[in-house]
Amino acid sequence: MMQPEVLQQQRDDATHASLQLRLPAGLLWFRGHFPGHPILPGVTQINWAMQYAHQLLGIEAAFKGVEVVKFQQPLLPEQQVRLLLEWQPERGKLLFSYRVGGATASSGKIALCR
């Protein structure tokens, strides 16, 4: 399994969306990262932010690079996390944050090109 379980998703407007996700222990991304203490890789978190931004906000721009990313706490198997997305079309930026129990686990800014 490569995708989280989507428990809830909401598009607030043309530039904001949020999802409630469950991270099943059987996700491919947990295997070997790290043995005995699996955590969700940062590259997966960035990929999911892009994927759900395309899906929910209709962003057609392509990935250019990560400008800023901050990992504050690991995302673990069986956790429920909230993914917040903000599209800034005039700047070509996608802001994302993963939250667990109200605390930010990771956040970042992705540059996109049209």
Which residues does each PLM region occupy?
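Catalytic strand-loop segment that frames the active site of acyl-thioester-processing enzymes
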Residues: 2-40
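Hydrophobic residues in beta-strands and at strand termini
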Residues: 21-23, 71, 112
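Acidic, aromatic-enriched beta-alpha/helix-loop junctions
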Residues: 35-56
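A broad structural signal for short, well-ordered beta-strand segments within beta-sheet-rich domains
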Residues: 6-7, 63-66, 105
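Generic "edge-of-domain/loop-turn" microfeature
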Residues: 26-28, 39, 76, 90-92, ...
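Hydrophobic beta-strand-centered segment that forms part of the acyl-chain substrate-binding groove
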Residues: 50-84, 89
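HotDog/MaoC-like acyl-thioester-processing domains
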Residues: 4-5, 12-16, 86-114
